[in-house]
Structures are given as C-alpha cells and as structure tokens.
Amino acid sequence: MNPDSNRFKQLESLAKKLGQAWTENTMIEGPDDFEIPHSREEAYFVQDHMAKFIGKDISGWKVGATSAKMRELDGHDDVIPGRIFSPVTFLGPIQKLHINQFPNARVETEFAFRLNEDIPIRDQNWTVSDMENIVS
C-alpha cells in the first residue's frame, strides 16, 4: 500500500498510539475519525507499523474471526491474523500473570498449536491424518 503522505501520517499516528499503549500497558482514547482505517489494507498497514513501533520479537501468530457467524456479527469479510509478541508469550505449566499487564482483559478461549515443519500449499485439502505429525 502506498498512501499519499497525508494519509500515511494519519495511519502512522494511529499505529504509534497503539504501539505506545501496548508497550506501556495503557488504553488509547478512541482514535480520531481521520485515523480510522478505511480498508483491510489500511488496517494491515497500521498493524505492520504498530509492530515496528513495538519492536519486540514475534513468537507466533493468532487468527481471529474464524467462524462465519463471528465475521458476520463483526462485519469482517475474512479471518484476521495478528502477531503475538514474545513478552506476552508464556511457556510452561505454571505462570503468574499480573493483571495490570492486560488492561480491561476479558476471558476468551484460545487454542494454540505448533507447526513442526512448513505446510506447503497444495491442490487437495489436508486431512487430520496428514497433519498428525506436523502439528503439536
């Protein structure tokens, strides 16, 4: 995406606000109307620039809006991928998480898995038996 310089500054402003809120564990005021992305492409632009501002290693990716009903309710036309940063990745059976690290947190079910090898694109669908040794 190559926004004009004015639009770039508007989207970059939102990315910086979001990145700063992430690093400081704070909330932002609602974005200014002119900062709101007008398309999926602009939203990914903000997400990419927010990640640059945060500057932390990526430990994985998450996918939101995975059900058709959720996409319908939220007005999305596809799933929504997002980065998971290493400072908020917790490994092991016992972890102590401080609630102030997650302002206005809500409980939500998450499923995680690890890809043990690359999964190439192919013409036929992957089956459970195909994936058993690839995913852990």
Give the predicted meaning of each segment.
Residues 3-136:
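Active-site microenvironments in enzyme catalytic cores
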